């Protein structure tokens, strides 16, 4: 079994304000994410999911407890560069991460700051753009791209740093359905084909359903942790947290409430149709 690339031990965090210390945002969170996993972290605004994400590459440091990246303590200043090389971050608004006026120059920005030789930078840029399907836009101006394309450029900029893990904090929040699909397809491909560990912070049920593992957060605590088809079976528990379930699960749940014996493990429309077809032929 792969070793943990991300690990928290009783992680507690409180923001400091001018008035003093604010309420606890993360309260004793302990989890372990292994190399190669695709993990979605689901929760409402204020659940602590984005604050947790910012601990994974030491943007934030614990008030109490520990965070380890590939065994390195994020509070160890001497390890900060190594930690950020291993874990890349992608945020909600791609415009806040794009720094150059040409796509390929933007993707090259990170490696240049690491002192990577020019020939290797060229190779990294080409590979990163190919990985996100943006090669043909290498010489385009980023501001002329669609939202989904901009976010893919932001992901390419992180990939050019050669991280072992990418943490994406609500990367589709500002995108239309087409842009969302572009970004989600890219994330899944990077995990499946390149073996990059992915942590996706989201409040979209359909996005969370695509992960291999789902962590549900509420009020700074982990409320559930398992495979999506397992977590989403607890319809009443999720609804008590103000969360919904994917539409196929909701449909099957209503059928079950009416006395129809159907499983709640179908997360997609096709899986739901298959479950209903099987029911009708029995």
Residue ranges: model-predicted function:
Residues 65-75, 83:
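Conserved ABC transporter NBD signature motif
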Residues 141-145, 149:
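Conserved ABC ATPase signature
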């Amino acid at each position: 079994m792969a070793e943990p690339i991300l690990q928290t031990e009783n992680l507690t965090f409180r923001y400091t304000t001018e008035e003093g210390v604010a309420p606890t945002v993360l309260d004793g969170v302990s989890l372990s994410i292994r190399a190669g996993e695709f993990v979605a972290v689901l929760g409402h605004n204020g659940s602590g999911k984005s604050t947790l994400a910012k601990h994974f590459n030491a943007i934030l440091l614990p008030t109490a407890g520990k965070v380890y990246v590939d065994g390195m303590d994020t509070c160890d200043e001497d390890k900060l560069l190594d930690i950020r090389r291993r874990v890349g971050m992608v945020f909600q608004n791609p415009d806040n991460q794009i720094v150059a006026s040409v796509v390929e120059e933007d993707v090259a920005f990170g490696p240049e700051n690491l002192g990577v030789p020019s020939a290797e930078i060229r190779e990294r840029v080409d590979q990163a753009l190919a990985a996100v399907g943006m090669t043909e836009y290498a010489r385009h101006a980023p501001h002329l791209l669609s939202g989904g394309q901009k976010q893919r450029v932001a992901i390419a900029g992180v990939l050019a740093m050669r991280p072992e893990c990418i943490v994406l904090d609500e990367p589709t929040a500002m995108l239309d359905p087409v842009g969302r699909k572009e970004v989600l397809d890219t994330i899944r491909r990077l995990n499946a084909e390149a073996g990059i560990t992915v942590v996706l912070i989201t409040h979209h049920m359909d996005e969370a359903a695509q992960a291999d593992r789902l962590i549900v957060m509420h009020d700074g605590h982990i409320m559930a942790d398992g495979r999506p088809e397992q977590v989403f079976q607890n319809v009443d528990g999720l609804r008590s947290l103000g969360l919904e379930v994917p539409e196929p699960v909701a449909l099957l749940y209503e059928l079950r409430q009416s006395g129809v014996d159907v499983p709640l493990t179908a997360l997609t429309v096709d899986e739901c149709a298959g479950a209903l077809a099987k029911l009708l032929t029995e």
